């Protein structure tokens, strides 16, 4: 099989199974996820994703669709997991939120924000602000201000409850901010 294949989903899955030593299996897994169509049996998709966690935003969406058909009790857990761990293409993210947004908790949104910040993507994290619980938004704004070296960072930090600032992640962000701004 060439690095880029037009093989159907089932053929990609068969190759993954039969050629366990295939170099860069992630390439085949991504291609398998891209090959899932509306005609692909939900049970086959579900089986695939129970053995291979999704790698793409489309894969996360197809896994959730299969779960709705085959194992509805898992949809909320998988939606939470996907939201916390996946990076979605903009169109997939909107579709995900339209379909599964009501399954998400405030903790899911905080976890996603935290992950995006750890990945060093404050501009993407900024888009999460409105989804965060009101009690967390001042801290999120302060973290964004530190990450982007905003001129009013000190003022924004003063608006955050001291208890919220006393977590390992926030202390690390403060130290990094102080170092970047030459104040450490």
Where are these regions (language model features)?
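Alpha-helical solenoid repeat scaffolds
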Residues: 1-184
């Amino acid at each position: 099989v060439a690095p880029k294949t037009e093989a159907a989903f089932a053929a990609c899955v068969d190759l993954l199974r039969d050629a366990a030593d295939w170099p860069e299996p992630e390439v085949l897994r991504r291609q398998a996820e891209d090959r899932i169509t509306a005609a692909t049996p939900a049970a086959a998709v579900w089986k695939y994703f129970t053995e291979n966690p999704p790698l793409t935003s489309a894969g996360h969406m197809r896994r959730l669709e299969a779960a709705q058909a085959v194992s509805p009790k898992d949809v909320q857990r998988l939606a939470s997991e996907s939201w916390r761990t996946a990076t979605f293409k903009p169109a997939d993210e909107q579709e995900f939120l339209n379909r599964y947004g009501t399954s998400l908790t405030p903790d899911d949104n905080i976890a996603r924000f935290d992950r995006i910040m750890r990945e060093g993507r404050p501009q993407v994290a900024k888009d999460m602000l409105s989804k965060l619980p009101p009690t967390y938004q001042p801290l999120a704004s302060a973290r964004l201000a530190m990450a982007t070296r905003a001129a009013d960072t000190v003022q924004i930090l003063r608006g955050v409850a001291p208890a919220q600032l006393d977590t390992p992640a926030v202390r690390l962000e403060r130290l990094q901010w102080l170092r970047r701004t030459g104040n450490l």
